Swiss-Prot record:
Topology versus the membrane: Single-pass type I membrane protein
Functional summary from the UniProt entry: Potential calcium-dependent cell-adhesion protein. May be involved in the establishment and maintenance of specific neuronal connections in the brain.
Residues with glycosylation annotation: N258, N549
Principal cellular location given in the protein's record: membrane
Residue span of region Disordered: 826-852, 865-946
Species per Swiss-Prot/TrEMBL record: Mus musculus (Mouse)
Encoding gene (name): Pcdha10
Protein name in UniProt: Protocadherin alpha-10
SUPFAM superfamilies xrefs: Cadherin-like
Residue intervals annotated with topology Cytoplasmic: 719-946
Coiled coil: none
Any single Pfam family the record assigns to this protein: Cadherin_2
Subcellular location(s) per record: Cell membrane
């Protein structure tokens, strides 16, 4: 053997490594079988193992050829030079395998590069190397000379450690004229060898006889064993004790208590006196274990239990007993006691769990084997018959594969999110009475699979963002939960890309993949994009990944970032100023011109008001401008003191915070009456255009009066009843003037398609009252009137907890806070009913909010109604409220009678400017605001002040 082989084979770790590699790697194909006789000398040739395995001799050392054995590994060795398997040390078959019929040495041949494992079995052939052996080499017999012929003397037979023919024994007795040897042919356990007296003894001729019993096996060469018999011939006691039966068969229950009588032996002796007195004992060849378990009474012959009787250890006892008399010499009688141990159920079953496959995937199919379970019970018959069962309410079952072996299999689908692990209790119960049982617990862990998609708390979220936000501002955070575990629950977020107009959604917003935070990437413009609706996808990290979507509705709230824009006028002079010719003979109330303006914003930010700008120290101007109409009219009769040329500056202001303004210039030339035809020719154009607008407005007034008829009738009736108790009577007819106006905060600017005409309460119908409803759907006007009437008749304290719902707040681009809300009084000392004012912020902590009723026509430009003081102007005793609200419209209508000198300034009605629809046009107007102010003038419509 080479040094390399010696190095790997004589170190302890070499064997361990070889066994490990044997267990891991797939063995080579085929199996070699050799045979070698036992007791072969060192170096005995066994086989050319390298050649038989197909290995070259030159590759044995480089490939680390080595041999491992689970048995004694030093018995055989391989010469790495020639590849021959040879005997390395003494092989004793009896020591190696005992009396087993088959005896083999199993070798594992291992080579590396690549790793291969070969199985080699070497059969050890038995040789006749063990002679027959008697229990004793000498035996003394005492035979009376008076012994009758044909007596039998029992002899213990020999035993041979070999097997097969090598252990087949034949017996021969040395030549004797008195004795012969009788060899039993059947039932060796019952009948031992018998030495037969064939001729009466004559003590006087031979007092002693020496015979040799020779046992010869069947091997080649034959081996023998001898038993020397020393026979003493006695003179008297010629009758040996005799048992009534040669074989006694007894049944004994296991676990019998000590002292339990097993059997009482009965032997008789025909002799008299001491020759007939019998003593009982176990035979000399009884094992120490038998003597420790049983006790025989020498006088009575009773055999009693003296130790533990265990069926599982020994189920049959074979005891040789003898009876000897007190003669001289004593005579012996022999018998055999066969004690059969009866089993009782004294052993509980044992459960062994093997091949546990954990964890179990939650999507494992039904029938998947989880574990192999074996049970055993050392008892016999029904006491050893074991049945197994499982704890209830588990998705598993036991399937019997073969006797005492079960498979724990999946019986129904698993769901880790419902139950992550199971504690399965296996119960094994035998068939004894009473039955014994044992339990074993198997913990089954359920491994997660990606079977749950991330889920959002809501399918849709509504978000409000002010326009002109800084880039990168955090808008909202979406959160999705995943019921899975580990990476299957790791959620990432992304946008569902789409186009918004001509641009991609990702140019507007982005979402953080891990946190779900949504950011606005650029400033949003309410005028360009009021609603940005998109979807966010949440995906987990499982394979395959699962995901779900959530919809985000981002409403862009309006800010006052657009100044009012003047609309062009038909007669624009140099420098963009509007030129008008007015005869000096015209009376008070004559409309000179009208300034028109629009605001691209919405809501409160688009509510416009008009006012004249006067120079400091200037005389009282004969002109005024309608606060909400933009109409420039004459306040008194013109005289010679008035300058012939009047330059009027009209300031147009919205009501945003801060307010934005625009200025219009109107040049008014006063002409004499004889120049009126010329002036009329210059003004004829606008008057003709106004007449056409009057016709249109008449229809609008009729339409809105029809829609609001119920409300108007209610208001007229209520006002008539209230006015009858006041010093100054107010009616809605031509007799008593009733002023209908808005508060001093301005007008709404909406597209002209939304304007409606309403009827004023003073004189004949006019065309200067314009009321607007924020996107009121058709057919809802009468319902609003009914609600207003109920409030008048049965005032109630409002609920301060009313709030907008999220859907109504979604479109609040801005809201209007009318600080001068009217208070309706019932009379002196009567209860006050505060009317709701339109507000976007309620500074008073006690103020409440109320959502408009469903179906009231409120769209994204919704109002927030506030019940509270609102800093109102208190009315004196007996006075009517200053203003009230037309339902469905942001206009505040005043029904309070004012002195004649104040009616001029408070009889203006609101107008609405045209809202720009595109961002491109708004930016153009913002960039050229100063130039547009000069280019745009006033235009006169049919509307005139009241």
């Amino acid at each position: 053997m080479s040094c390399v082989a010696m190095k790997y084979c004589h170190e302890s770790w070499c064997l361990l490594l070889s066994l490990l590699l044997f267990a891991i790697w797939e063995p080579g194909s085929g199996q070699l079988r050799y045979s070698v006789p036992e007791e072969a000398k060192h170096g005995t040739f066994v086989g050319r193992i390298a050649q038989d395995l197909g290995l070259e001799l030159t590759e044995l050392v480089p490939r680390l050829f080595r041999v491992a054995s689970k048995d004694r590994g030093d018995l055989l060795e391989v010469n790495l030079q020639n590849g021959i398997l040879f005997v390395n040390s003494r092989i004793d078959r009896e020591e190696l395998c005992g009396r087993s019929a088959e005896c083999s040495i199993h070798l594992e041949v291992i080579v590396d590069r690549p790793l291969q494992v070969f199985h080699v079995e070497v059969e050890v052939r038995d040789i006749n190397d063990n002679p027959p052996v008697f229990p004793t080499t000498e035996k003394n017999l005492f035979v009376s000379e008076s012994r009758a012929l044909d007596p039998h003397f029992s002899l213990e037979g020999a035993s041979d450690a070999d097997i097969g023919t090598n252990a087949l024994l034949t017996y021969r007795l040395s030549p004797s004229e008195y004795f012969s040897l009788e060899v039993p042919t059947t039932d060796e356990l019952v009948k031992p060898l018998q030495l037969v007296l064939k001729k009466p003894l004559d003590r006087e001729r031979a007092s002693e006889l020496h015979l040799v019993v020779k046992a010869t096996d069947g091997g080649k060469p034959e081996l023998t064993g001898t038993l020397e018999l020393h026979i003493t011939v006695l003179d008297a006691n010629d009758n040996a004790p005799a048992f009534d039966r040669a074989i006694y068969r007894v049944k004994l229950v296991e676990n019998a208590r000590n002292g339990t009588v097993v059997i009482r032996l009965n032997a008789s002796d025909l002799d008299e006196g001491s020759n007939g007195q019998i003593l009982y004992s176990f035979a000399a060849d009884v094992s120490p274990k038998t003597e420790a378990t049983f006790h025989i009474d020498s006088v009575s012959g009773e055999i009693k239990v003296n130790g533990k009787i265990d069926f599982e250890e020994t189920n049959l006892w074979k005891i040789q007993a003898e009876a000897v008399d007190k003669g001289s010499p004593p005579m012996f009688g022999h018998c055999t006691i066969l004690i059969e141990v009866l089993d009782i159920n004294d052993n509980a079953p044992k459960i062994i769990v093997t091949s546990l496959s954990l964890p179990v995937q939650e999507d494992a199919p039904v029938g998947t084997v989880i574990a192999l379970i074996s049970v055993m019970d050392p008892d016999s018959t029904v006491n050893g018959q074991v049945t197994c069962s499982l704890s209830p309410h588990v998705p598993f079952k036991l399937v019997s594969t073969f006797k005492n072996y079960y498979s724990l299999v999946l019986d129904s689908a698993l769901d880790r999110e419902t139950t992550a692990d199971y504690k399965v209790v296996v119960t094994a119960r035998d068939g004894g009475s009473p039955a014994l049982w044992a339990t074993a617990s198997v913990s089954v862990e359920v491994a997660d699979v990606n079977d749950n998609a991330p889920a959002f708390a809501q399918s849709e979220y509504t978000v409000f963002v002010k326009e002109n936000n800084p880039p990168g501002v955090h808008v909202f955070t979406v959160l999705a939960m995943d019921a899975d575990a580990q990476e299957n629950a790791l959620v990432s977020y992304s946008l569902v890309e789409r186009r918004v107009g001509e641009r991609l959604l990702s140019s507007y917003v982005s979402v953080h993949a891990e946190s779900g935070k949504v950011f606005a990437l650029q400033p949003l413009d309410h005028e360009e994009l009021e609603l940005l609706q998109f979807q966010v996808t949440a995906k987990d990290a499982g394979v395959p990944a699962l995901g779900s979507n959530v919809t985000l509705q981002v409403f862009v709230l309006d800010e006052n970032d657009n100044a009012p824009t003047l609309l062009p006028h038909g007669a624009v002079g140099a420098g963009g100023a509007v030129s008008e010719l007015v005869p000096r003979s015209v009376g008070s109330g004559h409309v000179v011109a009208k300034v028109r303006a629009v605001d691209a914003d919405s809501g409160y930010n688009a509510w416009l008001s008009y006012e004249l700008q006067f120079r400091a120290g200037s005389v009282r101007s004969p002109f005024r401008v309608g606060l909400y109409t933009g109409e420039i009219s004459i306040t008194r009769a013109l005289d010679e003191a008035d300058a012939p040329r009047q330059r009027l500056l009209v300031l147009v202001k919205d009501h945003g915070e801060p307010a934005l303004t625009a200025t219009a210039t109107v040049l008014v030339s006063l002409v004499e009456s004889n120049q009126a035809p010329k002036a009329s020719s210059r003004v004829l154009g606008p008057a003709a255009s106004e007449s056409s607008v009057v016709d249109v407005n008449v229809y609008l007034i009729i339409a809105i009066c029809a829609v609001s008829s119920l409300l108007v009738l209610t208001l007229v009736l209520y006002t008539a009843l209230r006015c009858s108790a006041l010093p100054t009577e107010v009616t809605c007819g031509p007799g008593k003037p009733m002023l209908v106006c808005s508060s001093a905060v301005g007008s709404w600017s909406y597209s002209q398609q939304r304007r409606q005409r309403v009827c004023s309460g003073e004189g004949p119908p006019k065309t200067d009252l314009m009321a607007f409803s924020p996107s009121v759907p058709p057919g809802l006007g009468s319902g609003d009137s009914g609600v207003q009437q109920e409030i008048f008749e049965n005032p109630r304290q409002p609920n301060p907890d009313w709030r907008y719902s999220a859907s109504l707040r979604a479109g609040m681009h801005s809201s209007v806070h009318l600080e001068e809300a009217g208070i309706l009084r019932a009379g002196p000392g009567g209860p006050d009913q505060q009317w709701p004012t339109v507000s976007s912020a309620t500074p008073e902590p006690e103020a409440g909010e109320v959502s408009p009723p469903v179906g009231a026509g409120v769209n994204s430009n919704s109002w927030t109604f506030k019940y509270g003081p609102g800093n109102p102007k208190q009315s004196g005793p007996g006075e009517l409220p200053d203003k009230f609200i037309i339902p469905g419209s942001p206009a505040i209508i005043s029904i309070r009678q004012e002195p004649a000198n104040n009616q001029i300034d408070k009889s203006d009605f609101i107008t609405f400017g045209k809202k720009e629809e595109t961002k491109k046009k708004k930016k153009k107007k913002k960039g050229n605001k100063t130039q547009e102010k000069k280019e745009k003038g006033n235009s006169t419509t049919d509307n005139s002040d009241q």
